[in-house]
Amino acid sequence: VPERNTPWPYARRNPPVEQITRKRPPPPARLLRRLARSLGIHPDDPEPFVGRLVGRRALIVCTNHAWLDVGRPTGLFASEMTVPYYLFSEAGIDVDLASPLGGMIAVDPLSFRSVVRTHHDDRFLVDDQLRAKVVRSLAVADLDIGAYDIVYFAGGWGAAFDLGFSDAIGEKVTQANAAGKVIGGV
């Protein structure tokens, strides 16, 4: 992950694998997270999915747009990629990441602040496999969209600058819709 996507010291820690699900932010951030959750931000799912969807494939389409026109870094909001990625993976779905140009997916550094970070984001920070997928995303134009059961669009400010203007994405979404694929986003 590029340096601009991991600007905080805690992003460089690599706890043992058995601690990933228990990784916790500092106490003030935990308190603020609880307050944010009580206000409806990143609520826990009262009825989590428990099925297995082995053999299915999902594509998460992310942005390459890394900078706002005012010179500030932007990209996708981390939880809008990490939450569906881990939920799909835990259900047994094979997940690929794609972007309009392929290669580096821009991640908004503000989405890693302790208060707004989810436990899925905490997991991403120590997950070398997903971090490698973020660095080497697939180019949408090169994909066989028919090979995927789900096409999901991850949001964030960067997505507003390139996802809606990509001819390749428009073509692939049209093909996915015609084939009856599940298409969603946030």
Question: Which residues does each predicted region cover?
Answer:
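Extended, subdomain-level signal for the structured scaffold at the beginning of enzyme domains
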Residues: 2-179
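Short, glycine-/small-residue-rich phosphate/pyrophosphate-handling segment
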Residues: 183-186
